[in-house]
């Protein structure tokens, strides 16, 4: 473990006797897991800290922010920001604004997704789903990585489906050891194949979620490979997380058994335990982490039941 010095358990880095307020940002945060992550940060961070709740719908973002700010357990300041993560320029502007105003950010959780359902052709949903989940991940990693303060946390919410074993072995070399530029190229090639109707012949699953999640984890691994040495020296964590099965409208169409599913608040708790830990386990750096444990990058088997839903 690498110990990172915090001030009196408040989740704040301290320099000498001076405590620096922390800046946290969560994307896709007006509902579901993202909202619960903001709630949890607001409750667990200090009164001088700032949590930014972001999303692309101004009205929903403002309403969600008011609800968190008014909650009895909220300790930190909570503000709303409109941010469409599929717009890379908008993400870059947000990062630059926070860098100029606050000297960087301490916690960034990339959580935004677009809902995908089995009752519509996957090709009709591909552009929005890939643009938000993968384009958003790439933009957040590129823009917020450089403004992350020492000891910070740059986290991408992915899934246990994000390990290579969930893909056809023919596709593994496309992601294994890839740079971020290469991951982006693979994602665009896959998107084009989905629209051309050739994706399945190339080995891609029908269900968009699987390649999307693998690409998210590959993107995190690519960025982490470049930063690892410097980040581990100052206690900075770049990682992907799997929150486990969460009972949300996004998950409901794809799974049958929700008997062990978590509420968004329950799922957020484990994610925030990692984010707010005062010690960094180097084994988690650049990896996909579920409930504090690393999921092997080459693990998993291709899911069948979800693709079968798309046969009807």
Where are these regions (language model features)?
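A glycine-rich helix->loop->beta "capping" turn
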Residues: 74-79, 97-110, 116-120
């Amino acid at each position: 473990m690498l110990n990172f010095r915090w001030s009196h358990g408040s989740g704040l880095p301290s320099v000498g006797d001076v405590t620096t307020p922390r800046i946290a940002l969560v994307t896709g945060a007006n509902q579901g897991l993202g909202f619960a992550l903001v709630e949890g940060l607001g409750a667990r961070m200090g009164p001088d800290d700032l949590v930014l709740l972001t999303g692309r719908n101004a009205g929903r973002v403002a309403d969600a922010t008011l609800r968190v700010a008014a909650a009895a357990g909220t300790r930190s300041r909570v503000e709303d920001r409109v941010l469409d993560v599929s717009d890379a320029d908008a993400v870059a502007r947000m990062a630059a604004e926070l860098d100029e105003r606050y000297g960087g950010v301490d916690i960034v959780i990339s959580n935004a997704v677009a809902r995908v359902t089995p009752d519509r052709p996957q090709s009709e949903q591909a552009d929005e789903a890939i643009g938000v989940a993968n384009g958003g991940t790439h933009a957040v990693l590129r823009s917020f990585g450089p403004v992350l303060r020492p000891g910070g946390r740059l986290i991408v919410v992915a899934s246990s489906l994000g390990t290579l074993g969930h893909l056809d072995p023919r596709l593994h070399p496309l992601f294994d050891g890839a740079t971020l530029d290469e991951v982006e190229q693979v994602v665009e090639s896959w998107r084009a194949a989905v629209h051309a109707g050739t994706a399945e012949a190339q080995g891609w699953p029908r269900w968009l979620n699987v390649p999307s999640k693998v690409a998210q984890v590959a993107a995190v691994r690519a960025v982490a490979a470049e930063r690892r040495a410097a980040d581990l020296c100052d206690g900075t964590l770049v990682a992907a997380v799997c929150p486990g099965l969460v009972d949300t409208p996004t998950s409901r169409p794809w799974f049958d058994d929700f008997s062990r599913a978590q509420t968004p608040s329950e799922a957020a708790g484990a994610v925030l335990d990692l984010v707010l830990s005062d010690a960094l386990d180097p084994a988690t750096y650049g990896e996909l982490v579920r409930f504090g444990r690393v999921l092997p990058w080459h693990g998993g088997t291709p899911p069948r039941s979800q693709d079968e839903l798309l046969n009807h």
